Protein backbone atom coordinates (compact mmCIF):
# COMPACT_ATOMS: atom_id res chain seq x y z
CA UNK A 1 0.00 0.00 0.00
CA UNK A 2 1.39 3.40 -0.99
CA UNK A 3 1.95 5.78 1.92
CA UNK A 4 0.20 9.13 1.54
CA UNK A 5 2.39 11.98 2.76
CA UNK A 6 0.62 15.21 3.77
CA UNK A 7 1.68 18.22 1.74
CA UNK A 8 -0.17 20.88 3.72
CA UNK A 9 -1.57 20.98 7.28
CA UNK A 10 -5.21 19.94 7.60
CA UNK A 11 -7.82 21.90 9.60
CA UNK A 12 -11.18 20.35 10.48
CA UNK A 13 -14.06 22.82 10.77
CA UNK A 14 -17.45 22.38 12.45
CA UNK A 15 -19.75 25.21 11.32
CA UNK A 16 -22.98 26.19 9.62
CA UNK A 17 -23.51 26.88 5.93
CA UNK A 18 -24.14 30.50 4.90
CA UNK A 19 -25.61 30.77 1.37
CA UNK A 20 -24.28 34.33 1.02
CA UNK A 21 -20.69 33.12 1.36
CA UNK A 22 -19.92 35.84 3.87
CA UNK A 23 -19.71 33.78 7.05
CA UNK A 24 -19.81 30.16 8.14
CA UNK A 25 -18.12 27.35 6.25
CA UNK A 26 -17.16 29.39 3.19
CA UNK A 27 -15.50 32.05 5.33
CA UNK A 28 -13.66 29.32 7.22
CA UNK A 29 -12.38 27.68 4.03
CA UNK A 30 -11.10 30.94 2.55
CA UNK A 31 -9.31 31.98 5.76
CA UNK A 32 -7.76 28.54 6.30
CA UNK A 33 -6.55 28.34 2.70
CA UNK A 34 -5.07 31.81 3.14
CA UNK A 35 -2.95 30.42 5.98
CA UNK A 36 -1.54 27.77 3.65
CA UNK A 37 -3.68 24.91 4.97
CA UNK A 38 -6.23 22.45 3.64
CA UNK A 39 -9.76 22.94 5.01
CA UNK A 40 -12.03 19.97 5.71
CA UNK A 41 -15.58 20.77 6.75
CA UNK A 42 -18.40 19.34 8.81
CA UNK A 43 -21.75 21.07 8.26
CA UNK A 44 -23.60 21.48 11.57
CA UNK A 45 -26.50 23.64 10.38
CA UNK A 46 -28.17 24.90 7.22
CA UNK A 47 -29.13 28.55 7.35
CA UNK A 48 -31.38 30.84 5.38
CA UNK A 49 -29.52 34.14 5.39
CA UNK A 50 -28.20 36.96 3.27
CA UNK A 51 -25.80 39.81 3.99
CA UNK A 52 -28.42 41.55 6.14
CA UNK A 53 -29.90 38.89 8.39
CA UNK A 54 -30.29 35.25 9.35
CA UNK A 55 -33.89 34.33 8.63
CA UNK A 56 -33.84 30.81 10.10
CA UNK A 57 -31.70 27.70 10.44
CA UNK A 58 -32.04 23.93 10.69
CA UNK A 59 -29.51 21.88 12.65
CA UNK A 60 -27.96 18.91 10.87
CA UNK A 61 -28.69 15.55 12.51
CA UNK A 62 -26.05 14.85 15.14
CA UNK A 63 -25.27 11.36 13.81
CA UNK A 64 -24.53 12.85 10.40
CA UNK A 65 -22.26 15.41 12.08
CA UNK A 66 -20.40 12.58 13.80
CA UNK A 67 -20.10 10.54 10.59
CA UNK A 68 -18.77 13.54 8.64
CA UNK A 69 -16.12 14.27 11.26
CA UNK A 70 -14.94 10.73 11.87
CA UNK A 71 -14.64 10.06 8.13
CA UNK A 72 -12.10 12.88 7.94
CA UNK A 73 -10.30 12.12 11.20
CA UNK A 74 -9.82 8.48 10.21
CA UNK A 75 -8.45 9.45 6.80
CA UNK A 76 -6.35 12.61 7.26
CA UNK A 77 -3.80 13.91 9.81
CA UNK A 78 -5.87 16.79 11.22
CA UNK A 79 -3.56 19.39 12.79
CA UNK A 80 -6.18 21.79 14.21
CA UNK A 81 -9.93 21.97 14.79
CA UNK A 82 -12.09 25.08 14.46
CA UNK A 83 -15.64 25.19 15.85
CA UNK A 84 -18.20 27.82 14.89
CA UNK A 85 -21.99 27.50 14.89
CA UNK A 86 -22.97 24.15 16.40
CA UNK A 87 -26.71 24.13 15.74
CA UNK A 88 -28.00 21.98 18.61
CA UNK A 89 -27.23 20.52 22.02
CA UNK A 90 -26.95 17.10 20.40
CA UNK A 91 -24.25 18.44 18.10
CA UNK A 92 -22.39 19.87 21.09
CA UNK A 93 -22.44 16.41 22.66
CA UNK A 94 -21.14 14.78 19.48
CA UNK A 95 -18.34 17.33 19.07
CA UNK A 96 -17.41 16.82 22.73
CA UNK A 97 -17.07 13.06 22.18
CA UNK A 98 -14.83 13.67 19.17
CA UNK A 99 -12.60 16.15 21.00
CA UNK A 100 -12.23 13.68 23.85
CA UNK A 101 -10.88 11.12 21.36
CA UNK A 102 -8.32 13.56 19.92
CA UNK A 103 -6.95 15.54 22.89
CA UNK A 104 -3.67 16.28 21.11
CA UNK A 105 -5.32 18.45 18.43
CA UNK A 106 -5.53 22.19 19.27
CA UNK A 107 -9.06 23.60 19.20
CA UNK A 108 -10.21 27.13 18.32
CA UNK A 109 -13.81 27.82 19.32
CA UNK A 110 -15.72 30.84 18.01
CA UNK A 111 -18.82 30.60 20.22
CA UNK A 112 -21.54 31.71 17.81
CA UNK A 113 -24.73 32.40 19.73
CA UNK A 114 -26.36 35.12 17.59
CA UNK A 115 -26.19 36.49 14.07
CA UNK A 116 -23.62 39.18 13.37
CA UNK A 117 -26.27 41.88 13.66
CA UNK A 118 -27.43 40.36 16.94
CA UNK A 119 -31.01 40.20 15.68
CA UNK A 120 -31.29 36.41 15.41
CA UNK A 121 -30.62 33.96 18.24
CA UNK A 122 -28.55 30.97 17.10
CA UNK A 123 -28.14 29.31 20.50
CA UNK A 124 -30.64 29.07 23.35
CA UNK A 125 -29.77 28.89 27.05
CA UNK A 126 -29.55 25.09 27.03
CA UNK A 127 -27.09 25.15 24.14
CA UNK A 128 -25.01 27.87 25.81
CA UNK A 129 -24.81 25.81 29.00
CA UNK A 130 -23.83 22.72 27.00
CA UNK A 131 -21.06 24.60 25.20
CA UNK A 132 -19.67 25.93 28.46
CA UNK A 133 -19.76 22.53 30.15
CA UNK A 134 -18.65 20.27 27.30
CA UNK A 135 -16.62 22.33 24.83
CA UNK A 136 -14.93 25.17 26.72
CA UNK A 137 -12.81 22.85 28.92
CA UNK A 138 -11.41 21.19 25.77
CA UNK A 139 -10.67 24.46 23.96
CA UNK A 140 -7.19 25.80 23.32
CA UNK A 141 -8.39 29.27 22.30
CA UNK A 142 -11.85 30.77 22.76
CA UNK A 143 -12.70 33.84 20.63
CA UNK A 144 -15.90 35.54 21.86
CA UNK A 145 -16.72 39.13 21.05
CA UNK A 146 -17.49 41.36 24.01
CA UNK A 147 -21.26 40.79 23.73
CA UNK A 148 -20.81 37.02 23.74
CA UNK A 149 -18.40 37.30 26.65
CA UNK A 150 -21.01 39.09 28.75
CA UNK A 151 -23.58 36.44 27.86
CA UNK A 152 -21.31 33.61 28.96
CA UNK A 153 -20.11 35.45 32.09
CA UNK A 154 -22.98 37.72 33.18
CA UNK A 155 -21.74 38.24 36.75
CA UNK A 156 -18.64 40.21 35.81
CA UNK A 157 -18.85 43.98 36.26
CA UNK A 158 -16.25 44.67 33.53
CA UNK A 159 -14.64 42.81 30.64
CA UNK A 160 -11.64 41.68 32.69
CA UNK A 161 -13.90 40.22 35.37
CA UNK A 162 -16.02 38.49 32.72
CA UNK A 163 -12.87 37.11 31.11
CA UNK A 164 -11.61 35.70 34.41
CA UNK A 165 -15.00 34.09 35.01
CA UNK A 166 -14.95 32.49 31.57
CA UNK A 167 -11.37 31.24 31.98
CA UNK A 168 -12.61 29.26 34.97
CA UNK A 169 -14.54 27.11 32.49
CA UNK A 170 -11.24 25.55 31.48
CA UNK A 171 -10.21 27.09 28.15
CA UNK A 172 -6.46 27.70 27.89
CA UNK A 173 -6.45 31.04 26.03
CA UNK A 174 -9.19 33.63 25.61
CA UNK A 175 -9.23 36.31 22.91
CA UNK A 176 -11.97 38.90 23.48
CA UNK A 177 -12.68 41.04 20.42
CA UNK A 178 -13.89 44.59 20.95
CA UNK A 179 -15.70 45.46 17.74
CA UNK A 180 -18.95 46.05 19.63
CA UNK A 181 -17.41 48.35 22.25
CA UNK A 182 -17.73 52.14 22.09
CA UNK A 183 -14.01 52.85 21.71
CA UNK A 184 -12.14 54.91 19.08
CA UNK A 185 -10.06 51.88 18.07
CA UNK A 186 -11.05 48.23 18.16
CA UNK A 187 -9.28 46.73 21.18
CA UNK A 188 -8.82 42.95 21.29
CA UNK A 189 -7.43 41.40 24.48
CA UNK A 190 -5.69 38.05 24.85
CA UNK A 191 -5.88 36.31 28.24
CA UNK A 192 -3.97 33.34 29.61
CA UNK A 193 -3.51 32.04 33.16
CA UNK A 194 -6.13 34.51 34.45
CA UNK A 195 -4.18 37.57 33.32
CA UNK A 196 -4.00 39.90 30.34
CA UNK A 197 -1.33 38.50 28.08
CA UNK A 198 -1.52 41.19 25.39
CA UNK A 199 -3.71 43.95 23.99
CA UNK A 200 -4.10 44.64 20.27
CA UNK A 201 -5.42 47.93 18.87
CA UNK A 202 -6.81 48.19 15.37
CA UNK A 203 -8.21 51.06 13.33
CA UNK A 204 -12.01 51.04 13.58
CA UNK A 205 -13.27 50.71 10.03
CA UNK A 206 -16.50 52.26 8.80
CA UNK A 207 -19.56 50.10 8.36
CA UNK A 208 -20.26 46.57 9.55
CA UNK A 209 -18.92 43.27 8.28
CA UNK A 210 -20.45 39.83 7.78
CA UNK A 211 -18.14 37.00 8.80
CA UNK A 212 -15.34 38.85 10.57
CA UNK A 213 -15.40 36.52 13.59
CA UNK A 214 -15.29 33.39 11.42
CA UNK A 215 -12.40 34.87 9.47
CA UNK A 216 -10.28 35.61 12.53
CA UNK A 217 -10.93 32.31 14.34
CA UNK A 218 -10.26 30.21 11.24
CA UNK A 219 -7.06 32.10 10.46
CA UNK A 220 -5.85 31.36 13.99
CA UNK A 221 -6.74 27.69 13.56
CA UNK A 222 -4.78 27.61 10.32
CA UNK A 223 -1.71 29.06 12.01
CA UNK A 224 -2.09 26.58 14.87
CA UNK A 225 -2.07 23.84 12.25
CA UNK A 226 1.15 25.32 10.88
CA UNK A 227 2.68 24.84 14.33
CA UNK A 228 2.71 28.49 15.37
CA UNK A 229 2.54 29.21 19.10
CA UNK A 230 -0.71 30.87 20.29
CA UNK A 231 0.47 34.44 20.96
CA UNK A 232 2.12 34.79 17.56
CA UNK A 233 -0.77 33.05 15.80
CA UNK A 234 -3.28 35.43 17.38
CA UNK A 235 -1.26 38.48 16.34
CA UNK A 236 -0.67 37.36 12.75
CA UNK A 237 -4.26 36.20 12.25
CA UNK A 238 -5.48 39.64 13.35
CA UNK A 239 -3.18 41.31 10.82
CA UNK A 240 -4.66 39.12 8.10
CA UNK A 241 -8.28 39.60 9.23
CA UNK A 242 -7.93 43.38 9.50
CA UNK A 243 -6.51 43.60 5.99
CA UNK A 244 -9.36 41.40 4.71
CA UNK A 245 -11.83 43.84 6.26
CA UNK A 246 -10.01 46.89 4.86
CA UNK A 247 -10.24 45.39 1.40
CA UNK A 248 -13.81 44.18 1.91
CA UNK A 249 -16.65 44.80 -0.51
CA UNK A 250 -20.42 45.30 -0.44
CA UNK A 251 -22.24 43.24 -3.04
CA UNK A 252 -25.57 42.78 -1.25
CA UNK A 253 -27.98 45.10 0.51
CA UNK A 254 -26.62 44.38 3.99
CA UNK A 255 -23.18 44.18 5.56
CA UNK A 256 -19.85 44.31 3.77
CA UNK A 257 -17.97 41.05 3.21
CA UNK A 258 -14.31 40.57 4.11
CA UNK A 259 -12.06 40.07 1.10
CA UNK A 260 -10.27 37.04 2.50
CA UNK A 261 -8.51 36.31 -0.79
CA UNK A 262 -7.04 39.79 -1.22
CA UNK A 263 -3.58 38.27 -1.33
CA UNK A 264 -4.44 36.27 -4.44
CA UNK A 265 -6.07 39.12 -6.33
CA UNK A 266 -3.42 41.82 -6.03
CA UNK A 267 -4.13 45.30 -4.77
CA UNK A 268 -3.33 48.90 -5.54
CA UNK A 269 -2.56 49.25 -1.84
CA UNK A 270 1.07 49.40 -0.77
CA UNK A 271 0.13 47.55 2.40
CA UNK A 272 2.42 44.63 3.20
CA UNK A 273 1.18 43.98 6.71
CA UNK A 274 0.16 40.38 6.14
CA UNK A 275 3.20 38.19 5.81
CA UNK A 276 3.31 34.62 7.02
CA UNK A 277 6.51 33.36 8.59
CA UNK A 278 8.57 30.99 6.48
Pin down the residues of each PLM region:
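Short, small-residue alpha-helix embedded
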Residues: 31, 151, 207-230
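Acidic-glycine-rich active-site phosphate/pyrophosphate-binding loop
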Residues: 2-7, 13, 24, 184-199
